[in-house]
Structures are given as structure tokens and as C-alpha cells.
């Protein structure tokens, strides 16, 4: 069998924040990808603003470096299971993976998720123990943990014989010896070339190119990114696109782009083993195969994990609608959601009975909150409902998504965390005492039990706990309520501006969400009640002026700091009868029915119907 020894295709996989993107930066720099005078941002592979801010990778990225006589195509993959749709498809495009594990933290839930995907594709990993220079680094123990994980995930004998490289990505060093570092990343380059198989060279056979990722460009339209599995593809070539429904469409390849560093470079042809981007077909989709017109031979369709969580997106109809956003109409919001579907194959958008609302389904809270955050930054205004898990019927049994949860917590908080997990129908799988005052707890918990849990967890552990979770499987649905918010809320009784005097008057009733000067409206949630019922309050109350005392005295009032919630915290906080109003400038919580009397009528009606 003829091989392309001048080429290697690898994916870099890891848990969030284990230094994967920084490692790729070093590989790019040390291979001489950038000119000496070229200004390159830190974490160059994270191109999206949100990726840079959060330090996570959301979209899979392609890059290529030349080391000696070998070209190495590198795919930097998302480390979060919410973007698992991307991870799975990338595994089809590569011949090996580099698994990055933190020298202190060891194996984490997302490490398990991405590694499982790689092993399922029979890929042989190269293990990189990163951050070897960290205090309390424990490389030998971490390698034992990795081996245990491989065995647990049914790795074959060849996969269990993985090579190990010890690295400090931030310092740009790597070595085969955990006790001393070389001066550069050469040990990693050499290990990749030695242990990752070269692609098969069958460029003379009929073409097979499969689309794994999508991109969109205003000039050339939709772009399919994938791998040439067989044959050669040339610019101007007339080919057939084998659609997912079995039909074929003919089109002409207008442009082929290869990858060099962080840039796409136009090329005239791509051969077996190459990873390229192709334009020319407007309705190209993930999983479809490009073949010669006279030799239609599609590859097996790529399987993509189904969504597990859904939310309703609604046109903003609050009293402040249209004030802060640029795009506020149903048409604009629908166009934006449809354009997201062009590149995000794990997303689903379904219409509802109302022309102003859509059910949007995704892989998890992070997946959907990233979409909402991007929309608000682009100038959209909308409202979203409480996230709900998607229930499936499997063999006639109602099943719900279950997650694997890993919690690292100081010993003194283990009791309260275990109790709170039990209340959310969590089952303990393992408990590991590291002997340094920290305990690792592993649970399986229904996904609906985790909605809204982050805030409770932070307060239980006083900010010292670390919570990670990833989708595990669908299991028969457990009876009864799981999780949810226990407290009621403080609801504004009228439109106005919050005042120090008004806030001070209700501080003892709960936690306040607004600061003095914040504009509020009737039905807007302005705080959390100490009790389990909702309470209507007046936060815009003014101190009465008299001859003796003027209203300016109000300025001396001292009040507690308001709790300002992020978008994710706001989404987690919601109940069924509430919306999160999202605009470019504000995130507000509100009741779906703004008027108190109408809310009470609706509650009575629901009770009468036997639904409460």
C-alpha cells in the first residue's frame, strides 16, 4: 500500500483550559509559520471574540505547518461536549490525535468525552502531559489515570501503547523525560511524525471527498471543508454531490483552498489525504460526498449527536422593546437563526403556532447561550424561555438525558454537595480523596437536575468547588420534579427608575438584582424573595419631600450591592412562567404575564385545570 509520507493529519483534543490552543500556537511559531515581523495574537487559533474572552474553543479550526519534509495538518477542536458535533466530524478527517492532559488536574469529564470519540474511530493517540512546570504537577499519576481511562473506554492493545510527551506549552518546551525539558517542541513534532500513520496515497483512483465542516463567505457562498479520501480534485472539475437523501446534484468546483498557518491559500488541485475547503455548491451539507459524475460512490453518512436541550426564542414584546437593539422584528430573528443553521449542524430551529416564536434545540446550555450572546453582540433583541431537556421515547419508554458530573471540592463541603446532588436525583459513581484536603466526587445526574445548579453549587462550596459535566446517555425518566429554583422572586409593580430609597425598603425581603437608576417596568424581576412565593414590590418609590427634608437626602441612603447575573446565570435562574429579555445593552428577567392581576387569573385557571 502506497503512503503519503510527506503528510500527517492530526486533531488536538483536550478538556477545556488544559492548554490545547496555546500548544498549537507554539507549534505554529516554532515551525516558522509566521514572519519575524508579523504581529500574532496570543491564542491565535481562537478567532472568535467569545473564544478569546472565555478561553474556550467553540469552532473547530484548521491549520497546517511544515516541519522538515513533512506537512502536518492540525485541527484544533472544541473541548466542551456542547460542541461535540464538531469533535465527532473532525475524528473522521484525521489519522491520529494528540490528547492534551493537565499535569495537575489529570483526566476530566471532557477529556473522557473527546477521547471516547477518538477511540471509536480507531485513532491512536499521542498523549501530551501539559503544564509540567505547574506547582504540584503529578505527571506519573496523571499517566496512570489516562491509562485507566483508556481501559475503561475499551481501547485496543495498539491504542494502549500510547507514546507520552511532557510539555510546557506556555514556555514552548517539550521532552520525553518528565524530569527535564528540552529547549523547544522538537520532541512533539518527532513523536507525531513517528506515531501518527501517513495517509494512503490513492490519488489515481476515482474521487471521494467528504464534507465535515461548513463555512460561509459573502464572495464565494457556502464552503465545504473536508478530506479527500480518494483520488484527486481539481478547480473547474465537473463533479457530483451525493446528497444525504440519496439524490445527486452536479456542480463545478470553482475554488479549492488549502491551509497554511492560519491562512487559507487557493490551490489548483487536492490529492488523497489533503484537508481542503471547496466552493461551488450553494446547498452543500455536512456528511455529503463529492464524487466524479461517472463514478457515484458516497461514503457512509457522518453521525451527529442529537440535541438534548431546547429553549423558545421569542420576539421582544416588553415595554422596553426596540430601545436598545438594531434587529428586533420576527423576520430579522428568523433570518439570523436560519443563517446559523448554515454552519451549526448540531442546532435545530422549529416554528411554533406563533409567528413570533421558535423552538431552538442544541447540545446544552453553553451551546445555546453562545448563540444568544453572539446575537446580542450583533445588535439583536429577543426573549428566551427556561431551558428544557428533550425527552425521547426509546423502545416505548420515555427517556431523558443523563450527565456525568465531576466535582472537586474541599473536604468540609462534601456532605452538603452530596446532599444537594441527592435532591437532584444524582447517583454517586466514585469518590476519590486526594489526601491534600480536596475530594473528587463523580455522579450521574439527569440533565434537568443540573439546570440552575451552578449558582447553588457556588454558594454551597463558597466558591471553592469546581463543577464539570458532560452528556453521558439517555436513560429511563425518573419520576417527580428534579431540581429547579426553590425561591420566589421580587417583581416590580410599576414602570419607573429604581431608587436607593425604594431598594432599601425591600432589602430585608431578599436579594436585589437592580442598582439605583436602573429603569424597570411592571412585571420585571428585580430580586429574589426570601420565601418560596413571588412578591410584588415598588423599587422606584421616592422619599416624600417636606418643608423640613428634601428628596436629595435620598443620596445618603446606604444599600447592599446588587447581584448582577451573567447571561448563563440568568438562563439557569428562569422558571416556566418567566422570560430572559436579551438586548445589546441589557439582560433582564421578567414574568411572561406582566400584570399582577392577569398572572393571578392565569394561575387560578391552571390550578382549576389540574395542571399545577
UniProtKB/Swiss-Prot annotation:
It catalyses: GTP + H2O = GDP + phosphate + H(+). Induction: 3-fold induction by growth at 15 degrees Celsius. Gene3D superfamilies: 3.30.70.240, bipa protein (2.40.50.250), Elongation Factor G (Translational Gtpase), domain 3 (3.30.70.870), P-loop containing nucleotide triphosphate hydrolases (3.40.50.300), Translation factors (2.40.30.10). GTP binds at residues 17-22, 130-133. It is found in: Cytoplasm. CDD domains: BipA_III (cd16263), BipA_TypA_C (cd03710), BipA_TypA_II (cd03691), TypA_BipA (cd01891). One of its GO terms (biological process) is ribosomal large subunit assembly. Its EC number is 3.6.5.-. Keywords: Cytoplasm, GTP-binding, Hydrolase, Nucleotide-binding, Ribosome biogenesis, RNA-binding, rRNA-binding, tRNA-binding. Residues 5-200 form the tr-type G domain. It comes from the Bacteria. Its main location: cytoplasm. GO terms for cellular component: cytosol; ribonucleoprotein complex. Disruption phenotype: No visible growth phenotype at 15 degrees Celsius. InterPro entries: BipA, BipA_C, BipA_GTP-bd_dom, BipA_II, BipA_III, BipA_V, EFG_II, EFG_III/V. GO terms for molecular function: GTP binding; GTPase activity; ribosome binding; rRNA binding; tRNA binding. HAMAP family: BipA. Belongs to the TRAFAC class translation factor GTPase superfamily. Classic translation factor GTPase family. BipA subfamily. Monomer. A 50S ribosomal subunit assembly protein with GTPase activity, required for 50S subunit assembly at low temperatures, may also play a role in translation. Binds GTP and analogs. Binds the 70S ribosome between the 30S and 50S subunits, in a similar position as ribosome-bound EF-G; it contacts a number of ribosomal proteins, both rRNAs and the A-site tRNA. This is Large ribosomal subunit assembly factor BipA. It comes from Bacillus subtilis (strain 168).
Amino acid at each position: 500500500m502506497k503512503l503519503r509520507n510527506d503528510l500527517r493529519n492530526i486533531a488536538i483534543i483536550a478538556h477545556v483550559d488544559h492548554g490545547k490552543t496555546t500548544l498549537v500556537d507554539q507549534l505554529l511559531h516554532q515551525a516558522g509559520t509566521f514572519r519575524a515581523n508579523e504581529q500574532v495574537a496570543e491564542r491565535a487559533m481562537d478567532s472568535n471574540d467569545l473564544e478569546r474572552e472565555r478561553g474556550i474553543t467553540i469552532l473547530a479550526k484548521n491549520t497546517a505547518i511544515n516541519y522538515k519534509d513533512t506537512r502536518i495538518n492540525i485541527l484544533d477542536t472544541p473541548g466542551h461536549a456542547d460542541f461535540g458535533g464538531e469533535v465527532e466530524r473532525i475524528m473522521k478527517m484525521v489519522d491520529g490525535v494528540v490528547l492534551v492532559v493537565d499535569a495537575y488536574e489529570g483526566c476530566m469529564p471532557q477529556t473522557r468525552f473527546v477521547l471516547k470519540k477518538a477511540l471509536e474511530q480507531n485513532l491512536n493517540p499521542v498523549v501530551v502531559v501539559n503544564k509540567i512546570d505547574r506547582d504540584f504537577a503529578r505527571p506519573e499519576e496523571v499517566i496512570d489515570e489516562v491509562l485507566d481511562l483508556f481501559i475503561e473506554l475499551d481501547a485496543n492493545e495498539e491504542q494502549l501503547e500510547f507514546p507520552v510527551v511532557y510539555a510546557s506549552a506556555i514556555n514552548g518546551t517539550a521532552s520525553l523525560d518528565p524530569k527535564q525539558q528540552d529547549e523547544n517542541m522538537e520532541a512533539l513534532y518527532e513523536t507525531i511524525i513517528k506515531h501518527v500513520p501517513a495517509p494512503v496515497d490513492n490519488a489515481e483512483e476515482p474521487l471521494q471527498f467528504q464534507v465535515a465542516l461548513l463555512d460561509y463567505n459573502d464572495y464565494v457562498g457556502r464552503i465545504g471543508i473536508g478530506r479527500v479520501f480518494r483520488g484527486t480534485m481539481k478547480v473547474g472539475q465537473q463533479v457530483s454531490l451525493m446528497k444525504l437523501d440519496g439524490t445527486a446534484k452536479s456542480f463545478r468546483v470553482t475554488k479549492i483552498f488549502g491551509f497554511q498557518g492560519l491562512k487559507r491559500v487557493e490551490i489548483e488541485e487536492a490529492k488523497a489525504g489533503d484537508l481542503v475547503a471547496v466552493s461551488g455548491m450553494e446547498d452543500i451539507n455536512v456528511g455529503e460526498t463529492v464524487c466524479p459524475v461517472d463514478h457515484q460512490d458516497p461514503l457512509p453518512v457522518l453521525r451527529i449527536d442529537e440535541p438534548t436541550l431546547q429553549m423558545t426564542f421569542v420576539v421582544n414584546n416588553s415595554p422596553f422593546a426596540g430601545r436598545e437593539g438594531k434587529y428586533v422584528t420576527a423576520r430579522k430573528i428568523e433570518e439570523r437563526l436560519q443563517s446559523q443553521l448554515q454552519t451549526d449542524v448540531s442546532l435545530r430551529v422549529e416554528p411554533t403556532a406563533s409567528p413570533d416564536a421558535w423552538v431552538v434545540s442544541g447540545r446544552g446550555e453553553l451551546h445555546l447561550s453562545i448563540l444568544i450572546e453572539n446575537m446580542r453582540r450583533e445588535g439583536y433583541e429577543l426573549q428566551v424561555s427556561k431551558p428544557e431537556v428533550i425527552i425521547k421515547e426509546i423502545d416505548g419508554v420515555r427517556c431523558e438525558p443523563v450527565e456525568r458530573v465531576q466535582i472537586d471540592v474541599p473536604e468540609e463541603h462534601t456532605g452538603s454537595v452530596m446532599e444537594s446532588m441527592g435532591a437532584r436525583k444524582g447517583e454517586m459513581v466514585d469518590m476519590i480523596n486526594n489526601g491534600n484536603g480536596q475530594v473528587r466526587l463523580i455522579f450521574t445526574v439527569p440533565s434537568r437536575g443540573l439546570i440552575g445548579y451552578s449558582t447553588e453549587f457556588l454558594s454551597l462550596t463558597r466558591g471553592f468547588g469546581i463543577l464539570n459535566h458532560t452528556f453521558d446517555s439517555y436513560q429511563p425518566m425518573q419520576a417527580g420534579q428534579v431540581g429547579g429554583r426553590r425561591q420566589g422572586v421580587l417583581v416590580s409593580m410599576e414602570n419607573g427608575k429604581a431608587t436607593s430609597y425604594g431598594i432599601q425598603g425591600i432589602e430585608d425581603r431578599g436579594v436585589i438584582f437592580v442598582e439605583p437608576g436602573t429603569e424597570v417596568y411592571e412585571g420585571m424581576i428585580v430580586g429574589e424573595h426570601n420565601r418560596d412565593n413571588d412578591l410584588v414590590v415598588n423599587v422606584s418609590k421616592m422619599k416624600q419631600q417636606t418643608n423640613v427634608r428634601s428628596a436629595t437626602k435620598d443620596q445618603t441612603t446606604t444599600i447592599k450591592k446588587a447581584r448582577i447575573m451573567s447571561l448563563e446565570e440568568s438562563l439557569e435562574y428562569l422558571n416556566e412562567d418567566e422570560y430572559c429579555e436579551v438586548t445589546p445593552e441589557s439582560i433582564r428577567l421578567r414574568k411572561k404575564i406582566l400584570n399582577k392581576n392577569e398572572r393571578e387569573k392565569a394561575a387560578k385557571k391552571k390550578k382549576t385545570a389540574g395542571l399545577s
